[in-house]
Amino acid sequence: MIELVTQHNDAASTFRDRFNATESGFHHVALAFGDHDQQVQRFNALGYASVTSFKTAEGRGATYLDTVAAIGHATEIYIVNDSLIELYANVRNAAENWNGQHLIIDL
């Protein structure tokens, strides 16, 4: 899956840390494996700082790590749970059933 993100303001964010409002580019890859906290600690121990962490009311969440100097982009580590799996099942369903009419689909 490719996720396209557009930030419609200049507020500070993990995306604005890398690109200003007139710039665009490849921001991050997302990884969904193992225990989130353990994986973040492993990356931190390797010298990659946690930049942003969040968790939604539904229990979805992630941590962005600063891996730009090493690999050219940030790395996102997901919290893997039923809510995340359901979200991506909905994304897949929307893609498979897309009628070609709307470029933006609200899920």
Predicted segments, located by residue:
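Glyoxalase I/VOC metalloenzyme domain signal
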Residues: M1-A49, G59, D66-L107
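A short beta-turn/loop motif at secondary-structure boundaries
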Residues: K55-A57
